[in-house]
């Protein structure tokens, strides 16, 4: 078993000429821009009872749902529509932490992304209204 020398040499060239650092700077700026777009859109359209946590690092937003809502149920509804969010039980077993959704913001904004976010918002709104 051997390594492809051409690919290995190209990688050495890429890394040794600081192209990687430039790529990372560009990527970080893009991810930050995408995250801000997601944040502002969700902030504008989610029910006021929901909180959005914007942490300075990473490309995820956390949406805190009302305590009555179960993030697993919302996840299951959305996954049936091919929309992926991460419910908090994937990250915590504490009962007090079961009402959060993690949203991946690493995607460039387009009509498909907006339609998916609109469906996330609609699903949360329906659950909030049903819980009142």
Predicted regions and their residues:
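PLP-dependent class I/II
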Residues: 1-132
């Amino acid at each position: 078993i051997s390594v492809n020398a051409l690919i290995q040499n190209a990688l050495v060239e890429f890394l040794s000429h600081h192209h990687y650092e430039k790529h990372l700077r560009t990527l970080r700026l893009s991810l930050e821009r995408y995250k801000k777009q997601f944040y502002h859109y969700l902030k504008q359209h989610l029910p006021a009872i929901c909180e959005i946590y914007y942490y300075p690092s990473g490309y995820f937003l956390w949406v805190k749902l009302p305590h009555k809502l179960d993030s697993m149920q919302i996840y299951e509804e959305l996954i049936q529509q091919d929309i992926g969010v991460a419910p908090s039980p994937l990250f915590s077993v504490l009962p007090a932490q079961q009402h959060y959704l993690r949203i991946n913001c690493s995607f460039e904004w387009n009509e498909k992304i907006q339609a998916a976010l609109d469906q996330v918002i609609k699903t949360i709104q329906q659950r909030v209204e049903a819980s009142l």
